[in-house]
Each structure stands twice: as structure tokens, then as C-alpha cells.
Amino acid sequence: MTRRFALIFVAFMATASLVLAACGAQTPALPALTDPKEILTESVLSLKDLKTVEVTGTFTGAVTLPELGALDLSTVKISAAADIPGKKAKFSLDAPTVLGTRIDALLLDTAAYYKIAGPLAMMAGGSADKFTKVDVPQESGKPVTDVAELAKQIDEFKALLDKLPTPPTKEADEKCGDQDCYHVSLKLTAADLKALDPTATATDGNFSLDLFTRKNDRLPARIALSVTAPDLGTVGMTFEFKYGGSVSVDAPPADQIAP
């Protein structure tokens, strides 16, 4: 009995040692960030290795259009998913209170399919019943994963942040579901935007952006946008992101494609 107990104890200790060794070999935690510009930059940089992403979007507020009155945006929903290496994606917009608008779109490498319900169908030449197929041009230029191109884009992004009349602010850290997140806010007026790009079309209003960045991998977890304008009121948009899931996108059956 004593010998058997000793063997069990040795086996237990060996197993525990393996478990502890595996835990110790895990990727160390990333260093904490305090500079809001650095958080924004690392959040953008984290996208270079992105494989799959799922996005959901919701809206608040209403917009007033000539001859149409106020359109409630609280029922508008967006969902999207993309497999970056697989070159496939899907997107849907459901806006029942915006003149019954609905958009469904699929992307498979060099072919895209879409169908549209509502007034936009006439403008885009689509159908509410069947998918319209269009060819997608092959990408030109350097891919975003090209090291030199990526470094150039990051430098341009940092330069843009340095030009902001009102710099971004780091707010208190928050929970994003089960993730610990940094919270960075950015507020701009129409005058700020004009200062950034004097050639841009004049806009009257205030804009705010709140970015919630996951601490463990720097990926964006949530983005909240808000626009306030005299002739528009206040419109809000919130986008939630998930990563690493399986994304399935298939071409529509032949009988569901418009001739």
C-alpha cells in the first residue's frame, strides 16, 4: 500500500509539474499602457495579424430628411463577418424604420453578391428578391501585411494624431464582456476637422469617438461614435467586435441570383 501510494504521489507531482511548466510557458502579459495615442496606435497595429472578425452594430437617435420627416434609427441593426485570409465576408443591414431598407451582401474573393429592399434598390440597381452579382477587381498595390507599407501607414497615423487640435484622452479602464479594456475618447468640433483638412467639405457639428481596446492583445473590442449637428440632432453608433471564430460564407444558389 505504501509503495502504491508513493507511485501515485510521484505521478501526481509529475503531472502537476507539467501543468505548472505549461502555465509558465504562456505568452507573458503585455506591458500596461497609459498614453492614449499609444493605445490608439497599438490598436491599429494589432489588426495586421487579423484572421477572422465578427461585427455587430446598433444605432440611436433619429435623422430628419426633407419630405420624409424624422426617421427612427433605434431599430437599425448591422452585422458583418470576415475571413481575411480566405477573402470572404458577409454583411447585413436591417433598417425597418428607414423606409423598410434591408441590405444583404456577400463577398467571395473576386465576386460579390447583394440584394436590397427599399428605395435604395432603385439607386443601386439591385433587387429585394434575388442577389445581383458583380465582379470585384483584384487588389493592387502592397498588402497591408507588407512590413514597409505597414510601418508607413503607422507613421502616417501617428502624424495625424499629433495634428489633432484636441488630443485623445485616456478614460478609466472598463470591462468589455469578459475582457479588460483600455478606454480612449476623442472629441472633435467642425473647426477641428477643418483644421485637419482645409479642403474638406464644411460640416457643422460635434463628433466624438470612444475606443475600447482589449488589454491582452490590443484588438478593438468596441467603438462608439456620436455625431451632433443642428439639422441632424444626435446620432449614435456602437460597434462590437469578436475575433477568432469560424466564418462561413457561401455563394447563393443559382436560382437565387438575378440574370
Feature-to-residue mapping (PLM):
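C-terminal motif of bacterial Sec signal peptides marking the signal peptidase cleavage site
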Residues: 19-22
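Subset-of-secretome marker
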Residues: 2, 24-259
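Bacterial N-terminal signal peptides that target proteins for export
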Residues: 1-13
